[in-house]
Each structure stands twice: as C-alpha cells, then as structure tokens.
Amino acid sequence: VKRQQRLILDTVLLGIIGALGARLFAFLLKETEILLLGRLAGYAPPGVMDGAAGGEVMGQHGLWLIPLVTTLGGLLSGMLVYGLSPEAEGHGTDTAVKAFHYASGVIRARVAPLKMVASALTIGSGGAAGQEGPTALISAGFGSVYASAGKRTDEERRLLVLMGMAAGLSAIFRSPIGTAIFAIEVLYSDMELDAAALLYTMVASVVAYAVNGLLVGWEPLFRVPPDIGAEFVDYFRYGALGIAAGIVAVFLPTVFYNLRDAFHSLPVPPHFKPALGGLGIGLIALALPQVLGGGYGWIQQAIDGRLTGFILLSLVFAKMIAFALTVGSGGSGGVFAPSLFVGAMLGGFAAHIFHQPAAGFVIVGMAAVFGGAARVPLATILMVTEMTGGYHLLGAAALTVMLSYMIQVALSESFRYRTLYEAQVPGRADSPAHHVEQLECAVHLLDTSRVCMPPTCTHLDLRALIASGIPVDLPDGKRLVIGMLKQKSSYVGKRVQQVFPPRKRERLEVVAVFRQGHTLLPHAGLLFQPDDRMMAVTTPGNWERLAEHFSPYTFDVGSRGGG
C-alpha cells in the first residue's frame, strides 16, 4: 500500500512536470519558428501552432529563402545532437520505448534539454516533423532522472518513464485518455498492452491535461463542425478509406527507414546529414510549402474543406518524403504529426472522391494511417477523437482504424520495416523488461523448491547464470537448465507431466514453464506449446539427449544505461 501511495504521488508530480515541460517546448518551438521561418525566410504557415485559424504569409522573396533556412536548421540541430548526445536524434518516442525495453528505463539527464532545443531548431526551421516525439522523450527523460535520483528499482523507473510519456503527450495533444493508453500500447507491435501501468499513466495524463487546460484553455486541438457524424451508408465509404489507409500505412515505415538507411550509408559526418535532409525538404517546399513543420494549420484547412483534390493527393506523398528526409537524416522531431498529416490528406482526398463533406473523412483518415503505421490502434482512435472533439465519429474511426491495422499487419509481414517505431517488440514475452520479472519469479521458485543450490550462489549470481543460458552445476551432480521447445517437437500438445512424470524426477524435474510473459507451474493440465521455455533440473547426459526437442535459450534482460 505504501508503495502504491508513493507511486500515485509520483504520477501527480510527473503530470505537473509533463504539462509544464510541454508548454515550455511549445513556447520555444513557436519562438524558433517565428525567428527562422518568419524573420529569416519571410514565411509563416497558416495556423502557427495548435491548429489555430490563420492565413499563409509570404515575404517579398516568396518561397526562395526557405531551402536556406531548412538547411540551416538541420545543420544547427545536427551539430548540437551529434556533438553532445547522439541519442537525442530522430524521433524521441522510439528512444523512450528502447529505454523501457533494453536499458531498465534509463535515459541520460542531458537528453531531455538537448532534445528540446534540437527539435525546436529542426521543426522551427521548417523540418517536417512533429512535437510528440520530443515531448515524449522530454517528459519520459524527467521520469527516468527522477527515478534514478530517488534510487528507485528498475521496475519503478520503467513505470515512471511511461507516466512521463503519457503526461507530456496529454498536454501537447489535449488527449488525457488516448495518451494514457498510447504510453502502454506503443511498447508492442502486436495487439498487447502493459495493462498494469494503466492506472498510473491515466492519472499522470489527466493531471497534465488539467494543468495544461489551466494554462492555455480546454478547447480541442482542431475545430470541427458541430453537426459532424456518420450515417449508415457512410460506413461503407469509411471502410474503403480504411483499406486505402492500411496500404499507405505499409509504405510509411518502409519509406522512412529506407531513407534513414540511405543517409546512414552516406560518406558524410553525421553532424551534416540533417542539413542535407533540410535542403531536400526546402526544395520540396518550393512547390508544396504545406510540407513544412508539423502542418496542423493545413490539417485544419483540410477539415474545413479548403484544399483541392490535386493538392490533397500530392501532399500524401510529398509529406511522406519530407518527413522521412527530416527525421531519417538525423533531424530531431516526432513521427506522429507527419503521420496525422498524411492521413488527413488521404481522408480529404477520399471525401473529394466520394463528394462528401471533408471534416469526417479527414479526422478518421488521421487516425487510420497512424494507427496502422505505428500499430497503436486503440490509443489512436481515442487520441484523434479527443484532439478534434469528434466523438460522434467514434464508431466510424474504430471501423476504419481496425481495418487499416489489420491490412497493415497482413501486408507488411514480408517487409523489413513493419512499424514506425523500430524499438517496439511483438509482445510482453519478447520484452527484456519482462524477462527480468520472469527471472525473479524463477529464482523465487528455486528458493521454495527442493533444488539443492550451491551455498555460495547469491540471487544476483543465479539471475546472471539463468539469463546467460549457461547450465548451472548443482552440488548433487545435476544441472539447472533452460531450453526452448522446438516448434516441430513431438512434445508439442502433450501434458508436461506426461512427458516428464513426477515419479521420474530423479532424471528430470520441471521447475517452471515460461510462456508469453507468464511463469507457469508444471501442474497436471499444463500442455506444452511451441516456443515454451522450460526451466528444469536434470542430469547432464539426459539433457543432451533432449537436444532434438529443446534448443538453448537465453533471456535478454537488456543493458543498464548510464545516468
């Protein structure tokens, strides 16, 4: 109870810090955009920040200075990031997810402030990236540093990282429920959640939403018509949009990561690569200035039905390339806003084809493309409806996003890059964070079992031995082993106690079976399934004879980063 009370207090603190950090970053980004794009290039996109209404402004030089400014922004960002903290490059959400899975939630203290400045330079100079990645990393980074300063456990540090991520995103997108779910859904590429953390991410995101509302108001990010909704026949049109969005969602990660790989292979110092990406964006902007920045103002114009069909379709592809150039070259920014932009333009084009009002299709299109490409369908449905206030479209959004998600998963199976977030793992069973929990459970089982452990073997030693996959020699001449059941083994589908009867435990005794993140005791009804990990005590010769059924297995428990 005391631990839970402390964590609830942590959620309130992180909610407040997340909201303040998000507002500070938004202010810094706005001022940088005014300085670089506004004063140097003489250009202001419509709706600077937060999707507010406003018109496009061009100076006396038109668009011709934009390539110089985008190149300058990329150069400054690259010099800052690669000179001081390379992990601040790219889209920050992926860095936070990677820290959760592989680094015990450790994010270096310098990353958050560097990410804030580098992202402001990238996006403020016209880079086609969003606020979500930097905000997520800034607030998650504070949660990590706060946990390390308080000497919290690895488990609590990971939880505080998720709380921070939810809080920052809630403030920036004004979406308390969707972002709470996003923080626990974005960890996995399959339909899985870290549900145990939902209580804490929800409280943190609601606190951040409330603090942000107190500071800047309670209006949704985008304005939608009050009579927006969907009739029965519209669901067929939304179904078609879901199919198209799923196809686009397949290619979004592919274009992004292939361009990133191309930049990595260039024989150019990494400090200068974001400048090359910035030059590419600037050249695209000479023809389509709508690709600059996050593009919230242009999304609002699409909702209002003020863009032509040709422009809408052109921007689907132009923004995809522009955002890949920005973030793939090493620029600092998020992938959420560009993905929303692509989906919004696709939805607007669908409305143009179907001769329907644009607002509903733009909103649902935003959710469908990102929900499929990032494989976060549940969170995206809620986030987009909260960001727009379009709650009457919840059913249509659910249908469209789920269709997009299913098509994206099916079609991307043979692709190298299947999701926008490279650090995602398929499910809890694949996360080193949860492998640690399984190992701790295994050690506890050994403590309470009849296994004769070496007297000098501590819990830490035992965890390290089990994680390495090296058999542990026991004083009675037996070995503690871990193996993965092969998919074609004849043991698949048979009861564990049928294969290894308790009466023959002197030859092999099953201690536990690890399956999909859970630790199972070898009870009478437990059946072997492919890829089960079995921990057992056996004789050396007997284990060698079982090699046709079990392959060696090591638990990936990640690495601990520095503070």
Describe each model-derived feature in a short phrase:
Residues V1-V443:
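Alpha-helical transmembrane segments and immediately membrane-proximal extracytoplasmic
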Residues L214, A410-S414, R503, G517, ...:
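Conserved NTP-handling cores and scaffolds of large molecular machines
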Residues W298, K478-I482:
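Intrinsic-disorder/low-complexity, polar/charged segments enriched in Ser/Thr/Lys/Arg/Asp/Glu/Gln
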Residues V362-I363, A373-A374, P475-G477, L527-Q529:
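A structural signal for short secondary-structure junctions
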Residues F415-Y417, G427-A433, F528-R533, F555-G562:
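A general structural signal for short secondary-structure boundary/capping elements
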Residues S431-R479, Q487-K488, P502-R503, G517, ...:
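Long, low-complexity, intrinsically disordered cytosolic termini of multi-pass membrane proteins
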Residues I482, K486-L546, F550:
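Cytosolic Rossmann-like ligand/nucleotide-binding regulatory domains
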Residues V511, E544, Y553-G563:
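Conserved short beta-strand edge segments in small beta-sheet-based binding/regulatory domains
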